[in-house]
């Protein structure tokens, strides 16, 4: 997410039951990236009656990381839209009350959810983009560190160094 490169053409799905660190992970990365991180509604990624590009995507133009929280169980992904978003396609949209513009999404998309959304298509084009990252461990109330987010935020400079090494 640091580079602005989407050459991997991926949608990263953080999947697992609750109380396992998905939100903590996303929140820390959001803090690390600051203004380069944007949150999107789950409705941005799910299939609706219309497949048009709306103002929700225009808001994501400058984002290096796009975080989406929770889809409803059984909701289907908007597969064509996800292919466009992750593929670097030139999209046309307009901000609310604004003029039309052309843009590409340069951010990596992370969906944190308890249940895998429905993917109806069987073609390689969508399935090669889906990168599921399992969060298999569930922490009981006694095991949870309620201050973990604060502790990790205090270590952002070290986390940034680690992330930069990963980019090189």
Question: What is the role of each PLM region?
Answer:
Residues 1-62, 131-134, 160-164, 168:
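P-loop NTPase catalytic core of nucleic-acid-dependent motor ATPases
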Residues 13-16, 67-68, 110-113:
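Short beta-strand segments
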Residues 21, 25, 56, 67, ...:
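Helical mechanochemical/support elements of P-loop NTPase systems and associated helical scaffolds
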Residues 55-62, 93-113:
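AAA+/SF3 P-loop NTPase mechanochemical coupling elements
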Residues 62-88, 101, 119-126:
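Conserved AAA+/SF3 P-loop NTPase catalytic/coupling segment centered on the Walker-B
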Residues 72-73, 114-118, 136-141:
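Conserved nucleotide-binding/hydrolysis micro-motifs of P-loop NTPases
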Residues 103-108, 122-168:
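Phosphate-sensing "switch" segment of ASCE/P-loop ATPases
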């Amino acid at each position: 997410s640091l580079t602005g490169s989407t050459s991997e053409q991926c949608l990263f799905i953080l999947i697992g039951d609750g109380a396992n660190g998905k939100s903590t992970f996303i929140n820390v990365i959001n803090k690390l990236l600051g203004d380069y991180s944007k949150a999107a509604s789950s409705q941005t990624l799910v299939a609706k009656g219309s497949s048009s590009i709306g103002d929700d995507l225009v808001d994501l133009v400058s984002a290096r990381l796009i975080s989406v929280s929770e889809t409803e169980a059984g909701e289907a992904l908007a597969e064509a839209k996800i292919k466009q978003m992750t593929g670097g396609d030139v999209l046309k949209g307009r901000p609310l009350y604004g003029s039309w513009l052309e843009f590409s999404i340069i951010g990596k998309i992370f969906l944190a959810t308890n249940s895998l959304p429905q993917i109806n298509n069987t073609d390689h084009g969508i399935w090669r983009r889906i990168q599921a990252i399992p969060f298999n461990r569930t922490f009981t109330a006694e095991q949870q560190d309620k201050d973990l987010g604060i502790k990790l935020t205090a270590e952002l400079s070290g986390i940034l160094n680690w992330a930069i090494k990963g980019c090189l």
